[in-house]
């Protein structure tokens, strides 16, 4: 990796890739009407003026459009990726040359990853962020865990239970040695965080229940125009993209096992079926299991499916969904991958420590493990996000939905003083995000008459559904 060494505040793989990145950003802007509409709406108004935003979210071409939207709205932005493999190096370079501090490159070590997260939380002169755009909750967690260890430095003695926690604690110890009240000062200045993904939202609610949340949060993930589009339709396209770029495998005729049938699992199951695979679903939730069965998918347990599958995809947000014992039983040449946020859905660490398997790297983010009996499996992206580790993530259009929500959430947090808690954007904004994307794909909306609106008890201009409505 070539580290750029100039007066600019960044660390990327290769700054010479900036021109390539800019060309792709220009293309992406045409596919992201929501973000471009927000730029036009607030042109000259700078609703985020004075804000300091730390972004911990995949540093892709689409994210570059989000970053430049936040900057155009007046924010001071620093950015890192939320996954060691998800950065598109040309996107990072293109943003870095504009003067936005970026700390991201594809293939970071865990130590480098947490160093990058540390950099985005430091705006100089003792200042931290007052807003965070988070994906998975790592930037939020660094502040909250740092706050806890400042109250109880004996936590450093434990040092973390796995490689990732050890890398995080090493950064926190370094910061503590420099300033033992750093995170108390940062937390006191925070206006809030907007969280992108299911896993990060679970973390927020868990911290709220334990009384550990230190600042307000907006749950962007559960906006309908995020979860029912990014999670579902985004995964429907990007999963197959990741698998095919990594393996060149023919999906038709294979047995694909999709673990989990939430919004992400639904997109993945339909993706694999659309390519001609026979799809088996595993689920813990009876409602989701019934949905899968009613869609025509076989629903069974992993213990039953493990000997049938040729492709295994975890989508659950839970840990140890595919165990070492499962991988020992898989058919020869099985492909194993994850599209949930963290790498602990698959027991990759126990697999790497297992003496009965040998590891051979085929190419970046593709590893072959051969077991004692001679059968092998292919692990993609080291069990991390396959669509970003082995491909380029979701298409621009669907990410425009998600990132429009993120931008609106940042404006909402900056302009208003929320109590500590986890909030959602109102239905009217959800509908507005959808409305901004209709013209791009040729949609013509029917308009209610006043009499029709009165008859069903809604305003002519919406919102059209109650808050509890399930789309």
UniProtKB/Swiss-Prot annotation:
Catalytic activity: S-adenosyl-L-homocysteine + H2O = L-homocysteine + adenosine
A molecular-function term among this protein's GO annotations: adenosylhomocysteinase activity
Coiled-coil intervals: none
Enzyme class: hydrolase
SMART domains, alphabetized: AdoHcyase, AdoHcyase_NAD
Cofactor entry: NAD(+)
Biological process according to GO: L-homocysteine biosynthetic process; one-carbon metabolic process; S-adenosylmethionine cycle
A UniProt-annotated Pfam family: AdoHcyase
Metabolic or biological pathway, per its Swiss-Prot or TrEMBL entry: Amino-acid biosynthesis; L-homocysteine biosynthesis; L-homocysteine from S-adenosyl-L-homocysteine: step 1/1
Cofactor note: Binds 1 NAD(+) per subunit.
Family under the similarity heading: Belongs to the adenosylhomocysteinase family.
Described purpose of this protein according to its UniProt entry: May play a key role in the regulation of the intracellular concentration of adenosylhomocysteine.
The protein's name: Adenosylhomocysteinase
Organism: Chlorobium phaeovibrioides (strain DSM 265 / 1930) (Prosthecochloris vibrioformis (strain DSM 265))
């Amino acid at each position: 990796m070539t580290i750029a060494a100039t007066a600019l505040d960044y660390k990327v793989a290769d700054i010479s890739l900036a021109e390539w990145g800019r060309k792709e950003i220009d293309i992406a802007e045409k596919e992201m009407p929501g973000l471009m509409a927000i730029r036009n709406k607030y042109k000259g108004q700078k609703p985020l003026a004075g804000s300091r935003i730390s972004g911990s979210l995949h540093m892709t071409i689409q994210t570059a459009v989000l970053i430049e939207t936040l900057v155009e709205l007046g924010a001071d932005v620093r950015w890192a990726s939320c996954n060691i493999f998800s950065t598109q190096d040309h996107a990072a370079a293109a943003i870095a040359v504009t003067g936005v501090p970026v700390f991201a490159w594809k293939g970071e070590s865990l130590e480098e990853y947490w160093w990058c997260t540390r950099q985005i939380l430091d705006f100089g002169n003792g200042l931290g962020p007052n807003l965070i755009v988070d994906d998975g909750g790592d930037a939020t967690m660094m502040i909250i865990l740092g706050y806890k260890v400042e109250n109880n430095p004996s936590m450093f003695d434990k040092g973390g239970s796995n490689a990732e926690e050890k890398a995080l604690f090493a950064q926190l110890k370094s910061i503590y040695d420099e300033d033992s009240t750093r995170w108390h000062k940062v937390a006191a200045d925070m206006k809030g965080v907007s969280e992108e993904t299911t896993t990060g939202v679970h973390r927020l609610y868990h911290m709220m229940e334990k009384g550990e949340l230190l600042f307000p949060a907006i749950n962007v993930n559960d906006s309908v125009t995020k979860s029912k589009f990014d999670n579902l339709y985004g995964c429907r396209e990007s999963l197959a993209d990741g698998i095919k770029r990594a393996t060149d495998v023919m999906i038709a005729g294979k047995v694909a096992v999709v673990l989990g049938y939430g919004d992400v699992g639904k997109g993945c199951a339909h993706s694999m079926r659309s390519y001609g695979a026979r799809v088996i679903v595993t689920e813990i939730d009876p409602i989701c299991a019934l949905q899968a069965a009613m869609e025509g998918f076989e629903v069974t347990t992993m213990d039953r499916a493990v000997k049938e599958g040729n492709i295994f995809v975890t989508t659950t947000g839970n840990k140890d969904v595919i165990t070492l014992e499962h991988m020992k039983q898989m058919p020869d040449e099985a492909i194993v991958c994850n599209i949930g946020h963290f790498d602990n859905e698959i027991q990759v660490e126990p697999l790497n420590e297992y003496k009965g398997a040998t590891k051979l790297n085929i190419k970046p983010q593709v590893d072959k493990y051969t077991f004692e009996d001679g059968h092998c499996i292919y692990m993609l992206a080291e069990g991390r996000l396959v669509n970003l580790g082995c491909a380029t993530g979701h298409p621009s259009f669907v990410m425009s939905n998600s990132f429009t929500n993120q931008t609106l959430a940042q404006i909402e947090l900056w302009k208003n003083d929320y109590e500590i808690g986890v909030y959602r954007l109102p239905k009217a904004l959800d509908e507005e995000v959808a409305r901004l994307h209709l013209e791009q794909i040729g949609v013509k909306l029917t308009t209610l008459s006043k009499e029709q609106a009165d008859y069903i008890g809604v305003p002519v201009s919406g919102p059209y559904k109650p808050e509890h409505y399930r789309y």
